[in-house]
Design a protein with these regions (language model features):
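N-terminal anchoring/stem segment of glycosyltransferases
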Residues: 1-75, 256-262, 274-285, 289-295, ...
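Short, solvent-exposed loop/turn segments at secondary-structure junctions
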Residues: 9-12, 52-55, 74-75, 105-107, ...
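Conserved donor-nucleotide/metal-binding helix-loop-beta segment in metal-dependent transferases, i.e.
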Residues: 109-139
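Short, flexible, basic/aromatic active-site loop/helix in glycosyltransferases
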Residues: 144-157
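Catalytic core and acceptor-binding pocket of nucleotide-sugar-dependent glycosyltransferases
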Residues: 154-249
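Long, compositionally biased intrinsically disordered regions
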Residues: 223-303
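Residue-level detector of alpha-helical secondary structure
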Residues: 282-285, 304-312, 316-319, 330-338, ...
Length: 363
């Protein structure tokens, strides 16, 4: 099974924009973790990106993708707020069964077994509550051309969507038709929707539209997570304390990206398991080293304030922990790692030499 991921710079400064995260360091730590975890379980993991994304994720961070397709520069006419267009382009890029995985999804096991012979696979089905309905009511005046498939949702008859933290399937013809209709939905209303600020139109031309089309066409849709979850009720999807024993799948969607504790637990995990990538990230963002000897003074800038606060709390024993001993031990291990990672510099060079060669496809 081919796995794909997509990153679009959105005409923004890749080194300064947090892309929904508290800061760039967390954003790229997420990519480090997501890609490397996927490579543990899959031999073919493809990145779809633009030239700026290639420069950061491949040339600088050396993420271990097996192939890279550079085609998202063609999205330059769109507002960066329409970030799901990059996913739509990625879905349309392959002509064989695939699963797309968001860059804020982390897996500790394979998940393609759920697809089987089903037409499609998604993370889970959502019930759209007043949260989505209020957003749609704000967006609706900007929509001059409404796809026929969206009429039931528009009239408040349908109240479902798909969460597409993962999405793909075997029915490539349907997926390509869905991508065509999603792009048309945006393009036929582009002048208005390009101006939308602070309203998430992506939910509707990606998640709601897919559900409506799949329902109309009677598609057999597999769900990785079997629960029907309310659109603003995602609980436990950032539980780093319980991976990999009790949780095999995390998705730091939406609000999770703005919670310092969640971001810092993710960063601590990356420091522990992928230190060579953190060293590259420090260099890329011109940060003072995160991985230092205990007690050594470090300089820091605004971008690193939350991370350093977490590290200092751990080292001083001031951080509140759960009652589970292994959580305390995990943080203790991370703290101790800070004292020895300088020794990793030579192994980092070795790792870079061992990185697999990639096929670069430019379009």
């Amino acid at each position: 099974m081919k796995i794909i991921q997509s990153f679009w710079s959105g005409n923004n400064d890749c080194l300064k924009d947090g892309y929904g995260w508290l800061s760039p360091i967390y954003h790229y730590a997420s990519w480090i973790l997501s890609c490397n975890q996927l490579r543990k379980y899959y031999d073919d993991v493809i990145l779809v990106t633009d030239r700026a994304g290639y420069d950061v994720l491949i040339d600088n961070l050396h993420l271990p993708y097996t192939n890279v397709i550079v085609c998202l520069d063609e999205l330059s006419k769109y507002s960066s707020n329409l970030w799901a267009l990059a996913k739509i382009k990625a879905y349309n890029a392959l002509d064989e069964p695939f699963i797309h995985v968001d860059g804020d999804v982390f897996a500790w096991d394979k998940f393609d077994g759920c697809l089987g012979e089903h037409d499609l696979i998604v993370q889970n089905i959502e019930t759209t509550t007043d949260y989505y309905r209020m957003m749609w009511n704000e967006i609706r005046p900007s929509i001059n051309v409404l796809p026929e498939a969206m009429e039931d949702y528009d009239q408040n008859v349908s109240h479902k969507a798909y969460n597409m933290g993962i999405f793909g399937g075997n029915d490539i013809l349907f997926i390509k038709d869905y991508c065509k209709q999603a792009l048309e939905f945006v393009d036929l209303n582009l002048e208005q929707v390009n101006k939308l600020q602070g309203i998430n139109f992506n939910i509707f031309f990606e998640q709601v539209l897919l559900h409506e089309l799949a329902t109309r066409n009677d598609k057999d849709v597999a769900t990785y997570i079997k629960e029907d979850i309310g659109d603003n009720e995602y609980q436990g999807f950032a539980d780093f304390d319980n991976v990999p024993e009790d949780r095999k799948y995390l998705h730091l969607l939406g609000f999770y990206k703005k919670i310092p504790t969640v971001c810092n637990k993710m960063l601590a995990y990356v420091i522990k398991y992928y230190p060579e990538y953190i060293m590259r990230l420090e260099k890329l963002l011109s940060l003072a080293p995160i991985i230092t000897e205990l007690g050594q003074d470090t300089t820091h800038n605004k971008m690193r304030t939350e991370m350093l606060s977490y590290k200092e709390s751990v080292l001083k024993g001031e951080l509140e922990t759960s009652s589970k001993d292994r959580n305390i031990m995990f943080r203790d291990i991370v703290s101790k790692l800070l004292s020895c990672m300088k020794e990793k510099s030579q192994s980092e060079v070795l790792m870079m030499n061992l990185l697999p060669k990639r096929e670069l496809i430019m379009s």
